Amino acid sequence: MEDLLDLGEERRRCPATSGAKMGRRAQQESTQAENHLSGKNSSLTLTAEVPPPKPPRRQGRWAEASVKVSKSQRRASEEIQDHRLRQQSLDRSDDGGDIPVIPDLEEVQEEDFVLQVAAPPSIQVNRVMTYRDLDNDLMKYSAFQTLDGEIDLKLLTKVLAPEHEVREDDVSWDWDHLYTEVSSELLSEWDALQTEKEGPVGQPAHT
């Protein structure tokens, strides 16, 4: 009986001790797993927060030259803009300094435009010689009586008629008046012809 009781007690103790041992081991394993997981998580967070450094760009000489040219162009454009702004500011300051002065009405001299007469334009007009001037020159100067120094015009000048005989008066023509004049002249000519024809017929014959 006593042996049986001792075996039962040992069995009771063994599972308790084994359970205790199993619990400690499990706790250790769980803590190790947690530590491992936390280490992984921390490494992941570190890798996520701090990205790896980017590799340096490989730039050739053309890229460097283009960058330098662009920088120089920017500087030149900025200098030009600064120069323009300075000139504009100087011009504005100069314009602001010169204030136009408006004269008073008393200082302005009143001009009477009514009394002023415009001067006639001086235009040189070539004077046309009249027949009288030509006749006078032809009669006075003997040089005009010869043409080209060889042809003598004295016979022609002696036969020239005066101006009042050659020149006709300007008379306005009326159709009715012209018709009556022409018809009367024609009738008078016809009458003269008729009388000439009838004259020898009506005369008596001489024996």
From Swiss-Prot:
The modification Phosphoserine is found at S77. GO terms for biological process: cilium assembly; intraciliary retrograde transport. It comes from the Eukaryota. The modification N-acetylmethionine is found at M1. It is found in: Cytoplasm, Cytoskeleton; Cell projection, Cilium. Residues 1-97 are annotated as: Disordered. The keyword Cytoplasm applies. Keywords: Acetylation, Cell projection, Cilium biogenesis/degradation, Cytoplasm, Cytoskeleton, Phosphoprotein. GO terms for cellular component: cilium; cytoplasm; cytoskeleton; intraciliary transport particle A. Residues 28-46 have a biased composition (Polar residues). Belongs to the IFT43 family. This is Intraflagellar transport protein 43 homolog.
